[in-house]
Every structure is written in C-alpha cells, then in structure tokens.
C-alpha cells in the first residue's frame, strides 16, 4: 500500500503513512497544516480505517496531546572515532540478497514503535539508494543496517550481544565524523546501547499519540 504525502481536504493537509497497514494493521498521520485539527484528524482516521488500519497514530499538532502518548522520535548524535574499532565486516546488499535482508529487517523491526515496514517494492528503492548492508564476522551474520553520509538509518542485530559491533561496522560506511541516528523513546534497549557507545540526545523530533477510531 502506498503512502499519501499530501492528503488534502477542506480542513487542511496531512501526510498518511500507510505502508504498514497490510502487514501490521498500523497507519500514521502527520498533520501538516490546519485550522480545524479535529475535523482534519477525523477525516484522516476514516480514510486510514477504510484502508484496513486497526491502530492509528498521529503527530504534528498540539490538539493531539489529549490522546494517549505512543512514543517520541529522538535524535541522537555521537562521534565515529569514539565508537571504537571492530573486526566485523560490511557486505553491501545486492539483488540476490535483497529479499533476505528485507525479511530480517521486517522481522527485527516488527515490535519497534514507528519503525518502517519495507515492502517488496520498497526494497527496490533501498537497492537503488545503495546504503543497505549485512554485518558479518568470520562468516557469521551479526546484523544488518542502513548507513549513508552522517546517518545510521537502520540498525538491527541478529546475534545477542552483537549490537555494538553492528553499530561500529556500519559507522565505517559514513563519510562524516558525526554520527546521527533516530530512535523511538520506547525502544529502551536501543537507547541503552547508544548511551553506552557515547551517543547523546540532541533533539526530540516528534511526539506520536494513539488515536481512537471510534471516539472522534
């Protein structure tokens, strides 16, 4: 299911993230501009529900603060040099290994709040971007991730205790000494890892709220 970057009606503009609906029954609403947030939200929720969403989350307006808090997206920054070294190696994802990478990503991220779901079509975009990797040590798969410029766009370990090595290895694909990553505030395990590696929270990028589908 395709996302709708500009969902427009008489009440305003919002972005609808629908890619997870077929798999996790979740939809996300990002309010862009409105003078009538309640009515815009109602229309967005109706549309997401018609698409099959059973859980809906929204961000982008103070009106939403009346609803139950879901998670916040935090921006963390660290120094690549301070991450240390690892003997783990990076292997870029290819067309032959793309489906394996996608399956691992979706499996590891399915319980992470606000994590994207990558469809078969979405994986083609990942391949085109060329920033997806497997992380191995001596032939053993430690994890996967996405890394480009100054950002770690995804980190997932498949071996217990290998998270630090996966982060270290992925950082070698970056062109910047400053490493930036975004993490859900409810992903406590990841936050503990990044804190241990010297990352500091520098911003709260968004706050997401759970929207009831029957009480609007």
Regions found by a protein language model. Give the residues of each.
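Alpha-helix C-terminal capping segments
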Residues: 55-58, 126-128, 145-147, 166-177
